[in-house]
């Protein structure tokens, strides 16, 4: 029996929500370990659509414990709003089935405002953030001035922590010619939020250690994707946290040995939201066709995603940096009906062939994809639930991806419905 970490092997939006929900049936605990409410996902259960951003997908299943780990940045307003919406849909969410790390960093209104101001002021060099305060909150965490959830329980020290935070932020705001924040207003707001948030607070590392020793199965749910990792992604067009699988240990307080099997998710093609390099992007009719058929619009932002062919080089790189044991390949059905499909197998950089994506921003912009053409298929793969339901050419496509990225496919998803999943290897039993 292994614990399982689910991470994106591309730029996010790979369908992690559905796969995590599908796997959570076998898990006792579902843990979010990084990111914030900037990475939304949509789940369809019994014909009903649920949209999550901050909460673990496990909240949609009865008798499961969901945990938000210390590696997450936590927006109180977004949290309470999401809980309210889920309750309105009949989902039970309470401290009985949801725990939040007491040492989680809080996202405050000043973080959201700073994030938005930076993006607007630097339009020519904007990263393409969701303007939800994720980056500024992580900056304060690293700068050792963040307000954390447990601080709301100590009103004697909270004012001093707010003063320390504002010493930094008000200096920035003076430089940006923005009005300063008043610490008393922030204290009043946090004091009002405390009774609603503190019942969820937990010493998460201790809780998870106890559950691990009891033999409980844990599912660690990553947000975004490996190519958005602050160290291993397409820097600076990345998120502000580590998104690779190793962060599951750091972001939950467990040791690396507790991680277990790593399942990497990738689409049968490639998408990206916002700015940054995208070697296989198809800014043409093919890209538009993929986007329309795949309904490629951001869950949170509604922004259209950029679309392109499958990039085996980038996914292979994610397999290595995340230690991925098996892939969950999603949205194969979107490629139904194409006469031929292109797959990127390498790059040319300044006239030389290379087998990896370079780290430098300039080099990333100059790489040219090397494509292999694969015959398409006309028969539908949508809603397939076994290999026997798949066209022979679709199976060949999957097998070729396995060869190119050096990793087997463990799961194959053929629609947003959780039942439309072909199981090759159960990650919990690997």
From Swiss-Prot:
Binds 1 Mg(2+) ion per subunit. It is an enzyme of class 6 (ligase). GO terms for biological process: 'de novo' AMP biosynthetic process; IMP metabolic process. Mg(2+) binds at residues 13, 40. Its EC number is 6.3.4.4. IMP binds at residues 13-16, 38-41, 130, 144, 224, 239, 303. The keyword Cytoplasm applies. Keywords: Cytoplasm, GTP-binding, Ligase, Magnesium, Metal-binding, Nucleotide-binding, Purine biosynthesis. The keyword Nucleotide-binding applies. Its main location: cytoplasm. It holds the Pfam family Adenylsucc_synt. It catalyses: IMP + L-aspartate + GTP = N(6)-(1,2-dicarboxyethyl)-AMP + GDP + phosphate + 2 H(+). GTP binds at residues 12-18, 40-42, 305, 331-333, 413-415. Pathway: Purine metabolism; AMP biosynthesis via de novo pathway; AMP from IMP: step 1/2. Substrate binds at residues 299-305. GO terms for molecular function: adenylosuccinate synthase activity; GTP binding; magnesium ion binding. It comes from the Bacteria. The active site is at residues 13, 41. One of its GO terms (cellular component) is cytoplasm. Homodimer. Plays an important role in the de novo pathway of purine nucleotide biosynthesis. Catalyzes the first committed step in the biosynthesis of AMP from IMP. This is Adenylosuccinate synthetase. It comes from Bradyrhizobium diazoefficiens (strain JCM 10833 / BCRC 13528 / IAM 13628 / NBRC 14792 / USDA 110). The lineage of its organism: Bacteria, Pseudomonadati, Pseudomonadota, Alphaproteobacteria, Hyphomicrobiales.
């Amino acid at each position: 029996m292994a614990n399982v970490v689910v991470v994106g092997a591309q730029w996010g939006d790979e369908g992690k929500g559905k796969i995590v929900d599908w796997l959570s049936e076998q898990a006792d605990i579902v843990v979010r370990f990084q990111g914030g409410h900037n990475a939304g996902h949509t789940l369809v259960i019994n014909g009903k659509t649920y949209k999550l951003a901050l909460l673990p997908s496990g909240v949609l299943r009865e008798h499961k414990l969901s945990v938000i780990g210390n590696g997450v940045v936590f927006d109180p307003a977004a949290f309470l709003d999401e809980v309210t919406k889920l309750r309105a849909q009949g989902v039970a969410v309470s401290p009985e089935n949801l725990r939040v790390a007491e040492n989680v960093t809080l996202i405050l209104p000043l973080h959201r405002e700073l994030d938005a101001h930076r993006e607007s002021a630097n339009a020519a060099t904007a990263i393409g953030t969701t303007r939800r305060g994720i980056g500024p909150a992580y900056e304060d965490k690293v700068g050792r001035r963040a307000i954390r959830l447990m601080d709301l329980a100590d009103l004697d020290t909270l004012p001093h922590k707010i003063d320390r935070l504002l010493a930094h932020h008000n200096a920035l705001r003076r430089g940006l010619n923005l009005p300063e924040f008043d610490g008393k207003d922030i204290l009043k707001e946090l004091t009002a939020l405390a009774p609603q948030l503190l019942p969820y607070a937990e010493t998460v590392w201790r809780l998870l250690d106890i559950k691990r020793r009891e033999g409980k199965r844990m599912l660690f749910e990553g947000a975004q994707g490996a190519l958005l990792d602050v160290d291993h992604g397409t820097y600076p067009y990345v998120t502000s946290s580590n998104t690779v699988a190793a962060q599951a240990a750091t972001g939950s307080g467990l040791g690396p040995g507790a991680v277990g099997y790593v399942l990497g998710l990738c689409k049968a093609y490639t998408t990206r939201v916002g700015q940054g390099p995208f070697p296989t992007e198809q800014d043409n009719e093919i890209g538009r066709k993929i986007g329309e058929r795949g309904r490629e619009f951001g869950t949170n932002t509604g922004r259209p995603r950029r679309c392109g062919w499958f990039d085996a080089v980038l996914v292979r790189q994610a397999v290595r940096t995340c230690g991925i044991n098996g892939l969950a390949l999603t949205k194969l059905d979107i490629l139904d009906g194409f006469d031929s499909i292109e797959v990127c197998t390498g790059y040319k950089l300044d006239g030389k062939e290379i087998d990896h994506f370079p780290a430098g921003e300039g080099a990333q912009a100059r790489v040219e994809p090397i494509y292999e053409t694969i015959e398409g298929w006309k028969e539908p793969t949508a809603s397939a639930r076994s290999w026997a339901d798949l066209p022979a050419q679709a199976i060949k496509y999957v097998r070729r991806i396995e060869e190119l990225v050096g990793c087997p496919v463990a799961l194959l998803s053929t629609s947003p419905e959780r039942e439309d999943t072909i199981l090759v290897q159960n990650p919990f039993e690997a």
